[in-house]
């Protein structure tokens, strides 16, 4: 029964992603029909203005697929490592930590390339994840969902104040950082795709390899240790994969919130907690969600556009509140 549900969910997710891909290419300041999109993708028919529009939008769509998949898988890994349903790069303050290191790089080292952003974002995200989990673990009951959310909010607020302190004195730094901070895939190019793709492949392969150990970890630290699992090593590898996926995407697209929260949580409700199924489905679902958000941003903001990070925040904030209410977590 569960296998049948998984197959149906996977088929529906893939169909949804294909639709979002076509919509992402078709919609914009100049709308293009689906038949034209399909002909252009396969280089059928004559060279027209519409075909050129389609070809110009393909990099944005491909980058959106990689970015959405990376953020969603990162969220699934963080939820599994912390055994916490609300773990997410944005809620845990990881995005803000990456932002702080990036703005420091812009202000003090005058960096301006995505390849340089990536390693700064990775360092900031990793240090923030360790800090937040350490703060949430203080006191009884360990890192509960509410304590993680509070620690993430506190760390995020403190780090954001540092971001503002570094950014505000310089108009040039502010201008360069401001557009990046909103979270957007609109300016993506094939160069960005070539930068992001290796990190996605490495992070995704490591996450798939960690699926079985993470299933064992879900039984609890003591039970997992009794079954022969190296718990610290499992957490370390899974966390590194999650931070790598999140940081590389954040460096190139800016901080995009709630993708890593909504998608894995939804699939966990539908197909259960098996990470072997959740991780690949999260990749497909995250890609579809980010493309949907990007497309809606273009439609709602026409003739301009809303950044995809704003749209995901508008969708994700109510979902976050519903998850918190459903969890009914009262312990601090």
Model-derived segments and their meaning:
Residues 1-332:
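Alpha-helical transmembrane segments in inner-membrane proteins
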């Amino acid at each position: 029964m569960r296998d049948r549900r998984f197959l149906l969910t996977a088929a529906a997710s893939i169909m949804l992603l294909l639709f979002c891909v076509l919509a992402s290419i078709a919609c914009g300041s100049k709308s293009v029909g689906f038949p034209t999109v399909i002909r252009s993708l396969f280089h059928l028919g004559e060279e027209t203005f519409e075909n050129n529009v389609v070809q110009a939008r393909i990099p944005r769509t491909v980058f959106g697929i990689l970015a959405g998949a990376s953020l969603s898988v990162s969220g699934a890994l963080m939820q599994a490592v912390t055994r916490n349903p609300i773990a997410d790069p944005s809620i845990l303050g990881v995005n803000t930590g990456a932002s702080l290191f990036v703005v420091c790089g812009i202000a003090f080292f005058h960096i301006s390339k995505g390849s340089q952003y990536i390693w700064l974002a990775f360092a900031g995200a990793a240090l923030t994840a360790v800090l937040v989990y350490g703060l949430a673990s203080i006191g009884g009951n360990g890192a509960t969902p509410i304590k993680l959310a509070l620690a993430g909010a506190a760390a995020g607020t403190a780090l954001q104040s540092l971001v503002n302190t570094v950014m505000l004195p310089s108009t040039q730094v502010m201008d360069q950082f401001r557009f990046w901070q909103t979270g957007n895939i609109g300016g993506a190019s094939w160069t960005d795709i070539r930068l992001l793709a290796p990190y996605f492949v490495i992070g995704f392969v490591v996450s798939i390899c960690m699926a079985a150990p993470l299933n064992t970890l879900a039984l609890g630290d003591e039970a997992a240790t009794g079954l022969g699992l190296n718990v610290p090593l499992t957490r370390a590898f899974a966390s590194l994969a999650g931070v790598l996926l999140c940081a590389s995407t954040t460096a190139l697209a800016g901080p995009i919130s709630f993708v890593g929260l909504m998608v894995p949580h939804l699939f966990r409700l539908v197909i259960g907690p098996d990470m072997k199924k959740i991780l690949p489905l999260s990749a497909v679902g995250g890609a579809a969600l980010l493309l949907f958000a990007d497309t809606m941003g273009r439609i709602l903001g026409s003739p301009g556009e809303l950044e995809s990070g704003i749209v995901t925040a508008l969708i994700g904030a109510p979902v976050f509140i519903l998850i918190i209410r459903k969890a009914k977590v009262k312990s601090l």
